[in-house]
Structure formats: structure tokens, C-alpha cells
């Protein structure tokens, strides 16, 4: 019975490759794929992520339902000339262990010793055995895997998608990417890397003068960063304490920016997204990747 349940779960996570669902979002992009919506799996994933949702105080965190709007932000960022994300794959609420292992084997950006010693165990854990498609928010979550050069997104938040894309940008501009990934085991390096990723997200939102999303980003990325800082506090619940401080600072900054933008609105706001829209019927006609 356990074997049958395990096989059934694996098949449900993987979806059916021969009958792909309609692609929901911006549409086919060579660097983006989306998993098939599976209500029982996605619903259970939401339950597993409740604690993370509470800590970050946002129900869209790890909600396994990425909207067209969030994907549009990702598409626009990836296609910017200044975004160094060539070759990076963006996987939206998807369980595809075959693709993950294939990308691990073919990712020449990271030298083979790093991929064997660090990439294999990392990928087996986060992409095969304990996939974010089900366990995001409980064990893992939105993340960038430098060994497969893949961003996995499960939250319907543009700021989170841009943050993870910022990790790709940060890693891809490094000459020694494997070493940069290895350095994360040194205390404090993770804080630097998380800061650089969030900095890239905020840069995009401020450059495009997307004030609503910038204000929302302060409320999400600051407490998220606080969990990393709090993890270094030698007390029980350090990450939670860090998140609370992040909420205070982030919401204070958001309030300050909101007042500033109301008092001094930009003369000519810059559009962050393509002005064309796609009808739901047209979207349903576009085939999906798994």
C-alpha cells in the first residue's frame, strides 16, 4: 500500500506529459516552464506553508498558484538587456526531477567537482526527494539552485520572483560560480547573497518606478531577510524574532515611501510590463510545458 501511495504521489506531482494543460500566464518563453495545476497537491502544499505565510504575513507566499501578473514581471525582467540571466531556467510551481538532473549534468557554468560533491545531494534533496511543489514553506521554498542554474517559484508575488531572479543575476555575473555557491557555508555569506538578490529586485522596481510593487516588496522581502539575520541569534525562535524586526523596518519604510510618492508623484511613470494583453481564450490555446 505504501508503495502504491508513493507511486501515485509521484505521478500526481509530475503530471501527465502527453496531455499538457493550458499555459496560464504570459505565454511560452524559452526560459520559463510551468507545472500542471493539481488541486489536491497544491492545496496540501498550502497547508504545509501556513507557518511561513504567518511569519511573512502574506497568504500569497508559497500558494502554488502563480498568476499571469507575476509571470509577466518575470518575463519582463528576464528579457531586459541588463539582466544577466542567460541560460537560467525558471520553473513555476513545477515538479520535474528529470529536467533538474539533466540540467545538473549539463550546467557548464559550474565546474564538475562542485556539481558532483554539492550539486548532486542538493538537487536530489530539493528537486527530487523533498520537492518544493509539495513542501515549499515547510522544508524549502522559492529558491535558486546554482548547480542546475534553475529558479523555482511557488509564491504568487512579483517581489519574490524578482528576488529569486536576482540570485540568478548575482551568480551569473560571478566568474567562479561554484566557489561562490560553496562560500555560502561560511557564516554571513548567505546574508550578503540574500542582500544582493533583494537589492536587484528593488533596483528593478525603482528603475521602472513601479511604486505599488516596491511598497509591497518592503513588506515581504524585509521580514524574509530578517529570518536569515535572526537565525544567527543564539536563542530559540531567533528567525521569528528577526522576521518581526524585518516587519517593523519594512513596513516603516513602505509607509515612508508611500507618503513620499503621494506628495511627489513621478512626472511620467515608467511602465514595467508590456501594454498588450492576452485574452483568457488565447491563453488557453497556448500549449504548456509540463
Where in the sequence are the language-model features?
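Active-site recognition of the HExxH zinc-binding catalytic motif
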Residues: 156-176
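Bacterial N-terminal signal peptides
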Residues: 6-14
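Post-HEXXH active-site segment of zinc metalloproteases
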Residues: 171-195
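Extracytoplasmic/secreted proteins, especially bacterial periplasmic and envelope-associated proteins
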Residues: 69, 73, 160, 164, ...
Amino acid at each position: 500500500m505504501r508503495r502504491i501511495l508513493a507511486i501515485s504521489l509521484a505521478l500526481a506531482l509530475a503530471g501527465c506529459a502527453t496531455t499538457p494543460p493550458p499555459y496560464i500566464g504570459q505565454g511560452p518563453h524559452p526560459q520559463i516552464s510551468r507545472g500542471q495545476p493539481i488541486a489536491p497537491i497544491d492545496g496540501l502544499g498550502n497547508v504545509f506553508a501556513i507557518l511561513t505565510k504567518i511569519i511573512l504575513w502574506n497568504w500569497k507566499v508559497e500558494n502554488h498558484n502563480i498568476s499571469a501578473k507575476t509571470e509577466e514581471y518575470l518575463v519582463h525582467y528576464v528579457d531586459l538587456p541588463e539582466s544577466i540571466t542567460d541560460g537560467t531556467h525558471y520553473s513555476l510551481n513545477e515538479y520535474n526531477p528529470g529536467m533538474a538532473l539533466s540540467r545538473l549534468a549539463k550546467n557548464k557554468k559550474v565546474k564538475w567537482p562542485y556539481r558532483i560533491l554539492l550539486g548532486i545531494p542538493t538537487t536530489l534533496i530539493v528537486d527530487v526527494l523533498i520537492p518544493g511543489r509539495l513542501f515549499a514553506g515547510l522544508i524549502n521554498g522559492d529558491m535558486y539552485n546554482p548547480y542546475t542554474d534553475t529558479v523555482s517559484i511557488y509564491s504568487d508575488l512579483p517581489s519574490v520572483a524578482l528576488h529569486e531572479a536576482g540570485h540568478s543575476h548575482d551568480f551569473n555575473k560571478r566568474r567562479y560560480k561554484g566557489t561562490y555557491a560553496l562560500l555560502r557555508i561560511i557564516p554571513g555569506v548567505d546574508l550578503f547573497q540574500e542582500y544582493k538578490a533583494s537589492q536587484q529586485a528593488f533596483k528593478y522596481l525603482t528603475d521602472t518606478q513601479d511604486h505599488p510593487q516596491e511598497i509591497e516588496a518592503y513588506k515581504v522581502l524585509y521580514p524574509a531577510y530578517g529570518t536569515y539575520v535572526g537565525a544567527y541569534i543564539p536563542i530559540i525562535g531567533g528567525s521569528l524574532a528577526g522576521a518581526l524586526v524585518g516587519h517593523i523596518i519594512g513596513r516603516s519604510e513602505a509607509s515612508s515611501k508611500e507618503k513620499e510618492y503621494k506628495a511627489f508623484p513621478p512626472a511620467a511613470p515608467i511602465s514595467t510590463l508590456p501594454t498588450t494583453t492576452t485574452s483568457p481564450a488565447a491563453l488557453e490555446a497556448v500549449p504548456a510545458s509540463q
